[in-house]
A protein has these predicted regions:
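DNA polymerase sliding clamps and clamp-related checkpoint/processivity subunits
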Residues: 1-26, 31-160, 166-261
Length: 261
């Protein structure tokens, strides 16, 4: 396919990660701007109720084909975007493009090589105000890596009883707590449990309570990556991140809840 009239174009066989990512974004955001440049795709957006910040980066070099001749903002309704991408099948590839003639439309094309079928959907782009969010660098006191499937299981289990989750790090021990549950995880010799990437003060108690709904939604990242990385610091937002297969990374940031909140 010629790219002569395309100002933005990517092609990839890594369809499952994009499919799972579209579901994750749909759950967390109503709409958002994909900022496309020659270096890749970035999204920084806050949920409609201002409760969670989502930060996504996909790197150009990780796609089989990628080109972006000028900086573009793709304003997407996340529900509509998910409805299109969820249709992709495991034996299909995905192509995204915007043409010079129609900069207000994103084309998403599925291709089945075996049957030589091209199925193209066209999404009208939205004019979404940018949040203009400046994310300052933060040095977190505890950074913990754990299995994404274990993280998902814990979040779902506790969500059956509570809408809040307390995360506490003491030394090299990590606790997940709710009013009727306490789950304690320690590092193991075979690295099958958790791993502390950093722990500034092993005697300090690092603790925060967070809205569990968004952590349950983000825990679907188990479909994207084997591990999640949890950054926690007293009186600071919680940062949870995972890789998007080998395409990039996605992070969420949650403010701690007060007893009244």
């Amino acid at each position: 396919m010629s790219n002569d009239n395309k100002i933005f174009h990517l092609w990839t066989s890594k369809t499952n990660p994009l499919k799972n990512l579209s579901e994750l974004l749909r759950d967390l955001l109503t709409e958002g701007n994909l900022e496309c440049t020659s270096k890749g795709i970035r999204l920084i957006s806050v949920s409609s109720n201002r409760s969670v910040l989502v930060h996504l980066k996909l790197h150009a070099e990780n796609f089989e084909e990628y080109s972006c001749n000028e900086s573009l903002t793709l304003g997407l309704n996340m529900e509509e975007y998910f409805k299109v991408v969820k249709l992709v099948e495991s034996n299909e590839t995905l192509r995204y493009y915007v043409t010079e003639e129609d900069k207000n439309t994103l084309a998403i094309q599925r291709y089945n090589k075996e049957e030589d079928i091209r199925n193209t959907k066209f999404i009208k782009l939205m004019d979404i105000p940018n949040d203009n969010i400046n994310i300052p660098p933060i040095s977190y006191e505890s950074v913990i890596v754990m299995s994404s499937s274990r993280f998902q299981k814990i979040c779902k289990e506790i969500y059956g009883f509570s809408d809040k989750l307390e995360i506490t790090s003491i030394g090299n021990v990590l606790y997940f707590k709710s009013p009727n549950t306490e789950i304690c995880i320690k590092p193991t010799d075979n690295n099958s449990g958790i791993k502390y990437e950093s722990c500034d003060n092993k005697d300090e108690i690092i603790q925060g309570t967070f809205n569990l709904k968004y952590l349950v939604q983000f825990s679907k990242c188990a479909n994207l990556s084997d591990n999640v990385k949890i950054h926690i610091k007293n009186d600071y937002p919680l940062l949870v991140e995972c890789s998007v297969a080998k395409l990039g990374s996605v992070k969420i940031c949650l403010a701690p809840q007060t007893e009244e909140g």
